[in-house]
Amino acid sequence: MEAMPCHNQRLGAAGGPRPQDEQTAPAGGCSRLIRFAEPSEGSSSGSPSPDSSSGSNGAAAAPSPAAEDCASPLGAQLKLLPMNDQIRELQTIIRDKTASRGDFVFSADRLIRLVVEERLNQLPYTECTVTTPTGYKYEGVKFEKGNCGVSIMRSGEAMEQGLRDCCRSIRIGKILIQSDEETQRAKVYYAKFPPDIYRRKVLLMYPILSTGNTVIEAVKVLIEHGVQPSVIILLSLFSTPHGAKSIIQEFPEITILTTEVHPVAPTHFGQKYFGTD
């Protein structure tokens, strides 16, 4: 079956992707395109929006089909959820300022679940044999233990239920990071993790990556608790090019999974999800 195109890949008779836009995955993987969408007309891609969930209730419209694509410079550390029309519709509802809160939360929860399941599919499994009710021996696999989740409060807490729906007994830690009123720099106010977090793979949850500063501070806290950046997997829904680049430049070993890279992030996410907009 022909692979579903990336959501930022133009279709039709205009021809295929340019050779310089193609990125090759590491050995054992498949080639795929990672593209940044261009901002909609009238928006500025030079000034990323703040990482906090404060902001206008509206989000930018979808990029113009005529917008020129640009290739990702971030390599294999930035991974996009395979695109299809279902995911595109969920993204559209989340960005639509006229969407009701019920539709918004429903769509966000669905998209979160898809991101979590995609990432769990990349974690280690071991082979096992089970016996069916009819006595048949079935060769299967089982999920390896040793993973945990960490949500960056408050918007990251929206992703906790999606993780628990897939891993009922997984342990989840929390980090609260806010901007200092005087310096406007990210400051850690609260952090609580499983005591053996340094031995676990960490699924760090933060739905909107705008500047990347909040995530960078969170990763620094995890490192202070003995966690290596190479075992941290950042789960997000939307990211700006600036946010993803800032995180990967600071921590080249970290992995980011998101559904879309776009210069304008829906920073109203946390307020609308929790009903405080």
Swiss-Prot record:
Lineage: superkingdom: Eukaryota
Residues annotated to bind 5-phospho-alpha-D-ribose 1-diphosphate: 154, 206-214
Cystine connections: none
Gene Ontology cellular-component annotations: cytoplasm; nucleus
Binding site for uracil: 267-269
Record carries keyword Nucleus: yes
Low complexity composition bias: residue spans: 37-69
Keywords: Cytoplasm, GTP-binding, Nucleotide-binding, Nucleus
InterPro entries according to UniProt: PRibTrfase_dom, PRTase-like
Coiled-coil features, chain-numbered ranges: none
Record carries keyword Transmembrane helix: no
UniProt subcellular location: Cytoplasm; Nucleus
Residue numbers binding GTP: 101, 110, 144-147, 171, 200
Family per record: Belongs to the UPRTase family.
Protein known as: Uracil phosphoribosyltransferase homolog
Organism, scientific name: Gallus gallus
